[in-house]
From Swiss-Prot:
One of its GO terms (molecular function) is potassium ion transmembrane transporter activity. Low-affinity potassium transporter. Could mediate the potassium-dependent cell expansion in growing tissues. This is Potassium transporter 2. It comes from Arabidopsis thaliana (Mouse-ear cress). Disruption phenotype: Plants display a short hypocotyl phenotype. Kup2-2, kup2-3 and kup2-7 are considered as null mutants. Residues 1-21, 86-153, 215-217, 287-294, 361-391, 498-794 are cytoplasmic. Pfam families: K_trans, K_trans_C. It is a multi-pass membrane protein. The keyword Cell membrane applies.
Length: 794
């Protein structure tokens, strides 16, 4: 949509175009967001009436279950998600990590290493809410003071992440199995039990095998399939209401819930584990918020998905209230008119595949986010579309999910056990979202704690009721998501814990700048042509792996760049703000530092574009740095020799911006002060890229007292030195680039506890050996790779 439309056509035309775009997004969201939620009528009633309760002539059970389904759909997806949780977005992004990122920006509870104050200057980092009040500052201070709460918060987020992964395994199994189960009405029992499982497994194998092609080629048919399915189930539901029981609307009264529990007692409470499946997929509304927007998801659910689901469930309840002795027990397909059975079966299978595809893609996305925040072992991430952001494929995870999904389908063989397992995973994710949203209400929205407590108690009690009912089915399938989440949580926490310890080891063993400056021919050190990119997690100082490299191979490249690729707690980092560049040592040393910042949903560049852009940023920095030096030298008349011994030995990291070539067109800039490791006050000025005629540049301003001893040189000499430095950079680029990475072996300190030794010596090293190396994550070509062996004692 053209943002200038309103200026050209008037506000009325602009509003019309805006609503047209929102409605289009709402339509497209059907295939991505609501596939899983829309197919739940296939198995809700069948799971609920599996064993715990029986259908009686009085219809109290049917009416009670219908009342529970209606109020659960109304309170959780509609009230909680559509009107509250969707507003807790992180720059338009949703999901567990979005909530965690939002909290970490308002409260210092992040466990991410190499955090810099300069990160707060990012445009996506801005805190738009009013200053904190007394009530939320108390909560903030309490959270920041107790370090164990930081770990507890991370564990809570990891729990939600692990349950999403478990849901990615269970949802395809139960969705496809329930859809294919419609064949039971057209087959004998003997043939049915030998046909459904193979057909389900075949569909699942095809589904996972096609993942590497991406969904962008067939994604345009997802929305029509789900729309057709919603119209189909709502139409059948309306027909059943009119045909069998027009008074089924009475079941919407909450009194039937209490009557149901009073009659069925413990059995009714245990049957809630099947009822909760009606909200399977509701979390996708928040998790996929970044692909659409708040208005589109709200409109699609409120005016289409919600009414269609209510009609579908009411239609099933109306049919079952008049058929107490069905030969095929209770299920979705018994309420479908016989003339529509085969078309509905075909649409149901297609809709189940679409719903499964959405949760599989969501699993890939959340694992990629976990990896970017250092909470998951390195895996290969393939971007399946150059046009659509976020379309990724992870081979290892895909095949693991496929094997486990088929194993679960063959092992459980019925909707009851699959529903018990899926329900527990779904409810655990919702509980995590409720807890994190209550923190957002206090810390980010600055609302009174009593409001957050009311939100937590109201929705938390509903979800705990369902969660407790799911736990009672532990031996009947609910053990699976608990086991899976435990395994994944151990893997993620061990990886994150050891990664933090490695960073602390690097921080303690970094080498001083003086050591680097002392390296020269007198010590037998030679400089070879080319650019050496030394990758490190440190944002200051010289990493120990470089000193080890020089010790074993007394040579390094003519142009040396210490590169730190780091993640910041924002979803995206604008390209104009991604690079922070600075000098390491004096000008003639040709050493630089570059910090590359990515958000947890950013797409990492391939090595060719990264290398080209990095050299471009270095060239821009060199030009502007010499321009600034010349101005300061002309104004202050300070000596270059003094500068080299003092100021240039200080590390200063700067940000990249775009500014106009013309002097009279200066963009608005924001300044933020921060201290480097030498306690020098720097000022970073960052601006948004201009729409036309712009060149990427770097602005770097230093306090005047940092150059007290600097002398002045002539403009001609400065230009000559500038050209010389740029020629050296160009020559080094033509000579080739080498990527220097550490190859780590980690072991626990002597005297460490048994748990720590198991986690570090066996757990982490096993994961490191069997997962992708850092060169794969950074997409480094093997021909340009130099690995330095490092032993970390943590």
């Amino acid at each position: 949509m053209d943002l200038n439309l309103g200026k050209c056509c008037g506000s009325r035309s602009s509003k019309k175009e805006s609503w047209r775009s929102v409605l289009l997004l709402a339509y497209q969201s059907l295939g991505v967001v609501y596939g899983d939620l829309s197919i739940s009528p296939l198995y809700v009633f069948k799971s609920t009436f599996a064993e715990d309760i029986q259908h009686s002539e009085t219809n109290e059970e049917i009416y009670g279950v219908m009342s529970f389904v209606f109020w659960t759909l109304t309170l959780v997806p509609l009230l909680k998600y559509v009107f509250i949780v969707l507003r807790a977005d992180d720059n338009g992004e949703g999901g567990t990590f979005a909530l965690y990122s939002l909290i970490c920006r308002h409260v210092k509870v992040s466990l991410l290493p190499n955090r810099q104050v300069s990160d707060e200057a990012l445009s996506t980092y801005k805190l738009e809410h009013p200053p904190e009040k007394n009530h939320d500052s108390c909560v903030k201070r309490y959270l920041e003071k107790h370090k164990w709460l930081h770990t507890a918060l991370l564990l809570l987020v990891l729990l939600g992440t692990c349950m999403v992964i478990g849901d990615g395994l269970l949802t395809p199994a139960i969705s496809v199995f329930s859809a294919v189960s419609g064949l039971e009405l057209n087959m004998s029992k003997e043939h049915h039990q030998y046909a459904v499982i193979p057909i389900t497994c075949f569909i699942l194998v095809c589904l996972f095998s096609l993942q590497h092609f991406g969904t962008h080629r067939v994604g345009f048919v997802f929305a029509p399939i789900v729309l057709t399915w919603l119209l189909c189930i709502s139409g059948i539901g309306l027909y059943n209401i009119i045909q069998w029981n027009p008074h089924i609307y009475k079941a919407l009264s909450p009194t039937y819930m209490f009557m149901f529990l009073r009659k069925t007692r413990v059995s009714g409470w245990m049957s809630l584990g099947g009822i909760l499946l009606c909200i399977t997929g509701a979390e996708a509304m928040f998790a996929d918020l970044g692909h659409f927007n708040y208005a589109a998801i709200q409109i699609a659910f409120t005016f289409l998905v919600y009414p269609a689901l209510i009609l579908a469930y009411m239609g099933q309840a109306a049919y079952l209230s008049r058929h107490h002795h069905s030969a095929h027990a209770i299920g979705f397909y018994v309420s479908v008119p016989k003339c529509l059975h085969w078309p509905v079966l075909a649409v149901a299978i297609l809709a189940s595949v679409v719903g499964s595809q959405a949760i599989i893609s969501g699993t890939f996305s959340i694992i990629n986010q976990s990896q970017s925040l250092g909470c998951f072992p390195r895996v290969k991430v393939i971007h399946t579309s150059d046009k659509m952001h976020g379309q990724i494929y992870i081979p290892e995870i895909n095949w693991m999910l496929m094997i486990l999904c088929i194993a679960v389908t063959i092992g459980f063989r019925d909707v009851k056990h699959l529903g018990n397992a899926s329900g527990l995973a779904v409810m655990a994710v919702m509980l995590v979202t409720t807890c994190l949203t209550s923190l957002v209400i206090v810390l980010c929205w600055h609302k009174p704690p009593i409001l957050a407590l009311a939100f937590l108690l109201f929705f938390g009690s509903i979800e705990l009721l369902y969660f407790s009912a799911s736990l009672t089915k532990f031996r009947e399938g609910a053990w699976l998501p608990i086991l899976l989440s435990l395994i994944f949580m151990i893997i993620m926490f061990v990886w994150h814990y050891t990664t933090i310890k490695k960073y602390e080891f690097d921080l303690q063993n970094k080498v001083s700048l003086e050591w680097l400056l002392a390296l020269g021919p007198s010590l037998g050190i030679s400089r070879v042509p080319g650019i050496g990119l030394v990758f490190t997690d440190l944002t200051s100082g010289i990493p120990a792996n470089f000193s080890r490299f020089v010790t074993n191979l007394p040579a390094f490249h003519r142009v040396l760049v210490f590169v730190c690729v780091k993640s910041v707690p924002v979803p995206f980092v604008p390209p104009a703000e991604r690079y922070l560049v600075g000098r390491v040592g004096p000008v003639d040393h040709r050493s630089y530092r570059c910090i590359v910042r990515y958000g947890y949903r950013d797409v990492h560049q391939d090595v060719d574009s990264f290398e080209t852009e990095l050299v471009s940023k270095l060239a821009d920095f060199i030009r502007y740095d010499w321009h600034k030096r010349t101005q300061q030298e002309d104004d202050n008349a300070r000596s270059v020799q003094s500068n080299e011994s003092s100021s240039e030995s200080r590390l200063a990291v700067i940000g990249t911006v775009a500014y106009e070539i013309e002097d009279n067109l200066q963009p608005e800039s924001v300044s933020i002060g921060f201290s480097t490791v030498e306690s020098m006050e720097d000022v970073i000025q960052m601006a948004e890229p201009a729409p036309t005629a712009t060149i990427r540049r770097v602005r770097f301003a230093v306090e005047e007292n940092s150059y007290e001893d600097e002398g002045s040189t002539s403009s001609a000499e400065a230009d000559a030195e500038l050209r010389s430095e740029l020629r050296d950079l160009l020559a080094a680029q033509e000579a080739g680039t080498a990527f220097i990475l550490g190859h780590s072996h980690v072991k626990a300190k002597q005297g460490s506890s048994v748990m720590k030794r198991l986690a570090v010596n066996f757990g982490y090293n096993f994961l490191r050996r069997n997962c992708r190396g850092p060169d794969v994550a950074l997409k480094v070509p093997p021909v340009s790779l130099l690995e330095v062996g490092m032993v970390y004692v943590v």
